[in-house]
């Protein structure tokens, strides 16, 4: 049997009814409380009223009553209740998405009020990409502790795409990332330019030269980080090279720079290393030679980024300024 058009109309009407209920709620001055939104967040995270109540440090009846009040305010159920636990409805999913942003903004408000006139004090959530974290943080963290003793730094290491998504969602205050990258909706401050080098087997012909051309590196067989690591795109773009064929990448790819160095040292091919990794001595972990790349601008730009319009912009600039003086 075909789809019943009435089902589509009922779904559309349901959406319109929900939108209408939101509008009517606003007009009547009935808005969800932050506590109710927190209850919804705990419920989504823990999957049951009992565990959510424990996480919220309230009784189960209190949390249940808060969710019911939220549903009355929104004019629609936010969860489906079952013996196996609770599942968010479509309305609940949308409410949770918006609640997450609202709760993060509320936390930012509290932190901003506490730290007014005292930047980089209190909680600060900083994201760092994997090709920066192990090389910059050992230098940066002691410096930040010395200059900002009241700073409580929470670090998250992840790929650029996910860090930017977290910035825009208000889950991070700033992130140390590398450009070029699509920075729509973000502001940033320059930290440094990081030159890219070629890492080749110590017994290879290229090891006997002072520098290598992109074409020479390509002929030796490129080994790159897995797709998603921005260093991969930066190096290829700087050298004017195309990504290796999919069939080749299935055999030779890595998830970290230390693994790449070991693969090069074993004679599997050549790769690119950022200058900060070379300075940290990463290439000394295997029989590898580091050579300059004969290209116009074989480098990436290290920046501190934050969400456009965020009140953390002043602190983002101060963080970048501090890291520039390291």
Locations of the language-model features?
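A short LG(V/I)-centered, amphipathic sequence patch enriched
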Residues: 49, 71-93
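Short helix-boundary/capping micro-motifs
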Residues: 41-62
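Hydrophobic hinge/microswitch elements
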Residues: 159-164, 168-172, 177-178, 228-289
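A late-sequence structural motif
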Residues: 136, 268, 288-326
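Secondary-structure junction motif
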Residues: 221-243, 312-316, 320-321, 326
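Interdomain hinge and pocket-entrance segments immediately C-terminal to HTH DNA-binding domains
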Residues: 33-34, 84, 90, 114-133, ...
């Amino acid at each position: 049997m075909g789809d019943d058009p009435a089902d589509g109309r009922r779904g559309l009407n349901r959406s319109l009814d929900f939108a209408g209920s939101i509008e009517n709620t606003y007009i009547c001055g009935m808005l969800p409380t932050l506590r109710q939104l927190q209850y919804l967040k705990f419920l989504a995270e823990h999957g049951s009223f009992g565990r959510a109540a424990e996480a919220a440090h309230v009784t189960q009846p209190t949390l249940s009553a808060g969710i019911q009040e939220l549903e009355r305010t929104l004019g629609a159920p936010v969860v489906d209740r079952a013996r196996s636990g609770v599942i968010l409805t479509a309305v609940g999913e949308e409410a949770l998405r918006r609640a997450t942003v609202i709760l993060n903004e509320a936390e930012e408000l509290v932190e901003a009020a506490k730290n007014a006139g005292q930047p980089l004090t209190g909680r600060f959530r900083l994201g760092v990409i994997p090709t920066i974290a192990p090389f910059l943080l050992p230098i940066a963290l002691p410096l930040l502790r010395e200059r900002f003793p009241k700073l409580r730094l929470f670090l998250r290491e992840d790929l650029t795409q996910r860090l930017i998504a977290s910035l825009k969602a208000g889950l991070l205050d700033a992130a140390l990332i590398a450009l070029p990258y699509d920075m729509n909706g973000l502001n940033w401050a320059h930290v440094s330019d990081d030159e890219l080098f070629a890492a080749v087997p110590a017994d290879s012909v290229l090891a006997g030269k002072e520098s290598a051309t992109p074409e020479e590196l390509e002929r030796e067989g490129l080994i790159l980080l897995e797709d998603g690591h921005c260093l991969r795109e930066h190096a290829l773009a700087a050298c004017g090279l195309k990504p290796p064929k999919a069939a080749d990448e299935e055999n030779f790819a890595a998830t970290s720079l230390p693994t790449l160095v070991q693969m090069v040292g074993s004679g599997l091919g050549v790769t690119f290393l950022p200058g900060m990794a070379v300075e940290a001595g990463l290439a000394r972990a295997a029989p590898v030679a580091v050579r300059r790349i004969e290209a116009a601008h074989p480098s990436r730009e290290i920046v501190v980024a934050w969400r456009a319009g965020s009140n953390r912009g002043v602190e983002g600039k101060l963080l970048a300024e501090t890291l520039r003086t390291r």
